[in-house]
């Protein structure tokens, strides 16, 4: 096996140009089997406004996947209505010559195949050489693959390079999707503007190598090269499920730096050699070396679990940084790679991994959990090294671009250092400690759900044979046989049977409520009963993945399994599943929950005196607001306010922050839209500074294009911005998109800042556990609450310290409150 492996063993379209003969459209093209089968035309490029033969103006080239039936019949390139819609907009915007062409030049009845792309690529390559474009827009994955030889990222604003040209290729949505989806259409226009003014994005390391560190000279050379980098990015590939498999191991570990096009890769046999791995160990443990990873807590945890090394110097996470700079950005490496010219870097291994995943599922059936965790062992050594190396190189380049972006948003990076970096460390310990689950209780809960489902099936039996899991059969029963009506349609034109529709029909026929109950039971069975059992490890605990970047609001999310959407404790199912949450003998579970946190955050940020006074007084906030508006809203004195009025006030209080419409508020509290508006106006009228703050956040968002969260105050008492969330829909002509973006302008600061209070508290609690050697563990976090498992004799100490740590923050005179049970 060679010590150096090429990162890009295959070329792109530009390298396939054949200079010795012209490649003009040919109705009897000998290269393509598609013509012979479909008898379709071979359609060439439409030069549009470009003067024939004039390449001095460096045109834009737009590539569509292949001719439509309309193009084929008319013999006119790119004349289909979907293509024309794109053409009209591009021509009107760019004000420069544009050439339109295809990835595959002939129409076919089915989707474009890889073989057809390869057969037609010389034609496209000829176009690229002839027109020497400054930028290529590839509409649809087939068009993108025709140009660069790899798949497009899932996100529309990815890019790659056309070989050795000084020309980049931007992946755009399929033109047919743009024609039918207004959301994608509006997003496309904004992304097009960004890329049209992008300058010169970075090129991929076409001459880079994955260097296999298989001898001590190579190991020392790797250390010397990496230690000179501004920072070192690292990535691991593993076999097995951490916490669950005794044979969990590292298959490889790769390092790279932002100023390098090479990666240094230690494979499994090199990792197990103490002498050979010593330089890599020094990199991981040296606090003077700035380390960066993509979802770094996974890599850190894997290294700790597999080889016992603590990565003390980890300082950056490109995945989390991406979310801090742009909440709405998809943050997977396959997506981020497209922002630094590395798009498609995972394609070579993808097919092998998918085949191995299918093989494992076929082998073990439903018993296997997370088959992809075992699939990487099937990669040939060279492909594994290249895959791992490209991951490290991509992470380095992504992180470097984010590092540069932080120069424009220094407060965001400061917030990473002050809060989020520590949260990543703390969450890794929460995952490691795990949440205690009693397997027998889960089995008992599963049996109970089966009994309930059997009873509902008896209800279904009176309506004849139908499958309650089939949306088509449910629709047939409800709308054709029973005559109910749905006010919502699916994309295919059928009446919808989604949850919202069925809830509107609830009470109009017994079978509707039975179907809703059936779906709830099935979801509980798949998530918290049968679905929970494979996640209970030998230690009697569940070790979920807790994600720092899982929600746009900044809140943590949880998966494998999701422990954050458990039914409320005041419901039957909620009580039953909670019986499985059992601390180990001699220990107790403690839950600490912030009280009305988001409303307190709104008071802190707006400094509304009335809101602040209510919280300082310690009274029930929702009851007090109901009393404040009782005469205006309901025509009753404050002392006559009842529970129903408090419930209505609570809905409006949160609705103000979430931007709920009067119609939605009316449905929530069971009154007319007019009455809901009166309650809203009455409450908001008592909080004038809150109203002005909401208007100010919206005004600032429209000016800057961003919503912000806040953390701390400066010397003048002003809130310091922490995270940024671009609001791309503020200027949208679609009223729904625009309204959603406007709501986010003031909801993001509240929810995101509340999330940061929770993150900061988690860090402090975990630090306290370690610093004081406290006999307890922080075992789960759910939105505004944390759960600890502590020794019985330490409960009082735990409660006092938890309250102290969670309420210690600077809140501009608005006290925080924590409910502990």
Regions of interest found by a model, annotated:
Residues 134-141, 233, 288-296, 589-591:
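Acidic beta-strand-to-loop metal/phosphate-binding motif
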Residues 2-203:
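A polyanion-binding, active-site-adjacent surface
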Residues 686-687, 804-813:
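A common structural junction motif
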Residues 390-397, 743-766:
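Conserved pre-motif C helix in the palm subdomain of viral-like polymerases
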Residues 197, 201-268, 309-313, 338-573, ...:
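Conserved "right-hand" nucleotidyltransferase catalytic core of DNA-directed polymerases
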Residues 60-62, 70-71, 75-82, 86-87, ...:
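Conserved RNase H-like, two-metal-ion catalytic cores of nucleic-acid enzymes
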Residues 148-154, 158, 166-169, 173-176, ...:
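Metal-dependent phosphoesterase core characteristic of DEDDh/y 3'-5' exonuclease domains
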